[in-house]
Swiss-Prot record:
Species this protein is from: Rhizobium meliloti (strain 1021) (Ensifer meliloti)
Annotated Gene3D superfamilies: Arginine deiminase, L-arginine/glycine Amidinotransferase, Chain A
Catalytic activity: L-arginine + H2O = L-citrulline + NH4(+)
Protein name: Arginine deiminase 1
Enzyme Commission number(s) of this protein: 3.5.3.6
Pathway where it operates: Amino-acid degradation; L-arginine degradation via ADI pathway; carbamoyl phosphate from L-arginine: step 1/2
GO cellular component: cytoplasm
Family indicated by similarity: Belongs to the arginine deiminase family.
Location of the protein in the cell: Cytoplasm
GO biological process: arginine catabolic process to ornithine; arginine deiminase pathway
Length: 409
């Protein structure tokens, strides 16, 4: 049975989920990348090499790395799992009733590895076999048009689900272009053999309902230990979602405090982890221009039903987090360089590091000023190339979904 649960941001990382660059990224163009919520086209071959290097460096430190294409492929061998995904992805509301009826038999018979590649990489009219209404669709649309859009942001596994102590959320995401990612996570957690028998709760989000204004993404969510959860509320995560997650955690006794961090809404600070991440139990790297503007609200449980009270915090975020963790003061490493360099390095994910254990982080090599400051503070910085992977606006923290992380001492 697989061990799961994330009990801190910097405890020993045991198991993590990633998604390598693949077909979805080969299909990015200057004309479609923004519709697919990817900032730029990437040199896929080089991005694959750099991602493989990232995986190897984690494995060298004893981390078990699970890859989403492989997990999904194994999951889709199960007929019930395949039906679960296709019922929701190959549906009239997604691709039209006639196209869905034509494609469903073809996809039901498809090899699971190929099906997994298409579910992540998308299906264009040109991919369809002859006789599947292909000629009619090709005459009406361009052959490169997608009947099932690719989801290239699967590269950033932090967002569609997040493990919080002994359970997980399957996150209703802010932009429609990313919501298919969550369906894949739901299928893996429900049906993959290594998760099917594991003991864990799904705190929230495992539903086909319309979540309306309740959206959440994992880049905003940090279980920092001792039953405390830090949640950014900026561009992508809303108070409507935070309240529901808090209630579920409090009802189960899984958390004692949820700290909501109200952030300015900006593309450069779309998630909390783009401006603030932990490097050690009491060490954080941050982009002060944004963090200094964050206002905090603490949620505390009132009863066994998960009802809670909300208290506005009058102190700066760093003081609130330090008090919650029981430390006198957080040691901070700000984005390095002068004003121009700091803004560039934050944009290039200089503060988006992932800890493999206390005091050891993975960072992009290009953020030389910030990495130097981290090393001077006693943090071991393992670097990976960021010239291609970073074009999607996410670093090591964004690209990883911890499945099992130990608490800190």
């Amino acid at each position: 049975m697989r061990t799961v649960g994330v009990h801190s941001e910097v405890g020993k990382l045991r198991t993590v989920m990633v998604c390598r660059p693949s077909l979805a990224h080969q299909r990015l163009t200057p004309g479609n990348c923004h519709d697919l919520l990817f900032d730029d086209v990437i040199w896929v071959h080089e991005a694959q090499k750099d991602h493989y290097d990232f995986v190897l460096k984690m494995e060298e430190r004893g981390v078990e790395v699970l890859e989403l294409h492989d997990l999904l492929s194994d999951t889709l061998i199960d007929a019930e799992a395949r039906k679960f995904v296709l019922d929701r992805r190959v549906a009239p509301n997604v691709m039209g009733s006639q196209i869905a009826e034509l494609m469903r038999p073809w996809m039901e018979e498809m090899d699971s590895r190929r099906l997994a590649a298409f579910l992540i990489g998308g299906i264009s009219i040109a991919d369809l076999p002859e006789g599947q209404g292909k000629a009619l669709m090709a005459s009406a649309f361009h052959s490169t048009q997608f009947v099932l859009p690719p989801i290239p942001n699967t590269l950033f596994q932090r967002d569609p689900s997040c493990w919080i102590y002994n359970g997980v959320t399957c996150n209703p995401m802010f932009w429609p272009a990313r919501r298919a990612e969550t369906l894949i996570q739901r299928a893996v957690y429900k049906f993959h053999p290594s998760f099917k028998g594991a003991a864990f709760d799904i705190w929230w989000g495992d539903s086909d309902e319309q979540f309306a204004n309740a959206t959440m993404e994992g880049g905003d969510v940090m279980p920092i230990g001792d039953g405390i959860l830090l949640v950014g509320m900026g561009e992508r995560t809303t108070y409507q979602a935070v309240g529901q997650v808090a209630k579920a955690l409090f009802k189960a006794g899984a958390a004692t405090r949820v700290i909501g961090c109200l952030m300015p809404k900006s593309r450069a600070a779309m998630h909390l982890d783009t401006v603030f991440t932990f490097c050690d139990r009491d060490v954080v790297t941050l982009f002060a221009d944004v963090v200094d503007q964050i206002r905090c609200y603490s949620l505390f449980p009132l009863d066994d039903e998960g009802n809670f009270e909300v208290r506005q915090e009058d102190r700066p975020m760093l003081e609130v987090v330090a008090e919650a963790l029981g430390v006198d003061k957080l040691r901070t490493i700000a984005t390095g360089g002068n004003t121009y360099e700091a803004e560039r390095e934050q944009w290039d994910d200089g503060n988006n590091v992932v800890a493999l254990e206390p005091g050891v982080v993975v960072a992009y090599d290009r953020n030389t000023y910030t990495n130097t400051l981290l090393r001077k503070a006693g943090i071991e910085v393992i670097t990976i190339r960021g010239s291609e992977l970073g074009r999607g606006r996410g670093g090591g923290h964004c690209m990883t979904c911890p499945i099992w992380r130990e608490p800190t001492d």
